[in-house]
Amino acid sequence: MADKGSGDKLLYCSFCGKSQHEVRKLIAGPSVFICDECVELCNDIIREEIQQADSQKGASSDLPTPHEISGILDQYVIGQGQAKKALAVAVYNHYKRLRSSSGSGDVELAKSNILLIGPTGSGKTLLAQTLARLLNVPFVIADATTLTEAGYVGEDVENIIQKLLQKCDYDVDKAKQGIVYIDEIDKISRKADNPSITRDVSGEGVQQALLKLIEGTTASVPPQGGRKHPNQEFVQVDTSNILFICGGAFSGLEKVIRGRTEKGGIGFGAQVKNVDENKRDAELLHQVEPEDLIKYGLIPEFVGRLPVVATLDELDEAALVQILTEPKNALTKQFAKLFKMEGVDLEFRDDALNAIAKRALLRRTGARGLRSIIEHALLDTMYDLPSLKGVSKVVVDNALISGEGQPLLIYSEQGDQPLAAGA
């Protein structure tokens, strides 16, 4: 090591050219010198290269397998096994495609966007949200009913990409790997089988506008959420790697499928239709073909951009009871945690869970209606509980859900007492 005052000869760093008087230390080698500043710079370069290599290695190894994706979805969404399998494979292949480094001569892998078909409250949105949270990518929900063609009153389709950019603080590279869920996609179906002389700006027109966005194009988005105007610089976002998931209830689609699958005739030699009264609409939806979606009102080009079609079953009473109790964020667990903040335990009896599920079925709102039923049943209890002293437990039974009784309050030193109305 060469110190600043050693010898009469002035020494210089062989890398940056600084003299021994301009640096703190000068390290000597065989006819070579390096200063402490260059050593520190080399350490920084090596550290960055190691971090980049580790991140690339971690990116490929962190991608869960389809089995793992489906297993994580099971923790949040009850049932819908076939839809989970289709989603898991499609998402795995999509992000494997993004993380693979393909050369110029390699085969180009096309993107497989997804169409989810199922009744309201069956878990379409929750599946997409859980996938985005699992993969740690930006996620945004768009409502197809608010979209119109460019130039008309309503939201432009490029507003979807603007929302995605806002989600990730206008980090374009991060937005390019996001997931966009377009809800109520069935509401932009063509209004009639034959083209009308009046322009359909919220139906077929929106489908036409979404075509390029879903397939992959460069969208021009105003910076920081501003409105479009001339002489403005736009943020350019390539949508080729954004995964689009479209979902809708497609009410009436089962009739289209039934018309295709059940053939009949007229006359003595006609084959009599064997209409299975027990054949549920959900079973028919599993037989959906692209031609059915086209007849329903989606244009052929739009159907072609959604090659992966997954159907969700309508939830029955048993599935709704499972949704109330089994998922990680089950409603009974959420309300139990809410009551625990007051120092009170909350118990749902089995007859109460069945009653909640039956009421949700009557409302035909699926799992989405479960929370409102519980909120309504526990409204008075949550209003009075903070003012009551000594309550250790609240028990919810069938009588409370049906509106014929009050919850049982268990006090720390007394027996069961029903909560008096307006107490």
UniProtKB/Swiss-Prot annotation:
Q: Give the Gene Ontology MF terms in alphabetical order.
A: ATP binding; ATP hydrolysis activity; ATP-dependent protein folding chaperone; protein dimerization activity; unfolded protein binding; zinc ion binding
A single GO cellular-component term from the record reads:
HslUV protease complex
Q: Which residues bind ATP?
A: P119, T120, G121, S122, G123, K124, T125, L126
Asked whether the UniProt record includes Protein biosynthesis among its keywords, one would answer: no
Tell me the residue numbers annotated for binding Zn(2+). C13, C16, C35, C38
One Gene Ontology BP term is: proteolysis involved in protein catabolic process
- Cite the Pfam families for this sequence: AAA_2, ClpB_D2-small, zf-C4_ClpX
Q: Which SMART domains match?
A: AAA, ClpB_D2-small, zf-C4_ClpX
Keywords from UniProt, A to Z, are: ATP-binding, Chaperone, Metal-binding, Nucleotide-binding, Zinc
Q: Which residues form the ClpX-type ZB domain?
A: 1-54
Q: Does the keyword ATP-binding apply?
A: yes
Q: What does this protein do?
A: ATP-dependent specificity component of the Clp protease. It directs the protease to specific substrates. Can perform chaperone functions in the absence of ClpP.
Q: Which NCBIfam families match?
A: clpX, PRK05342.1
Belongs to which family? Belongs to the ClpX chaperone family.
Assembly: Component of the ClpX-ClpP complex. Forms a hexameric ring that, in the presence of ATP, binds to fourteen ClpP subunits assembled into a disk-like structure with a central cavity, resembling the structure of eukaryotic proteasomes.
This protein is called what?
ATP-dependent Clp protease ATP-binding subunit ClpX
Q: Which organism is it from?
A: Thiobacillus denitrificans (strain ATCC 25259 / T1)
Q: Which gene encodes it?
A: clpX
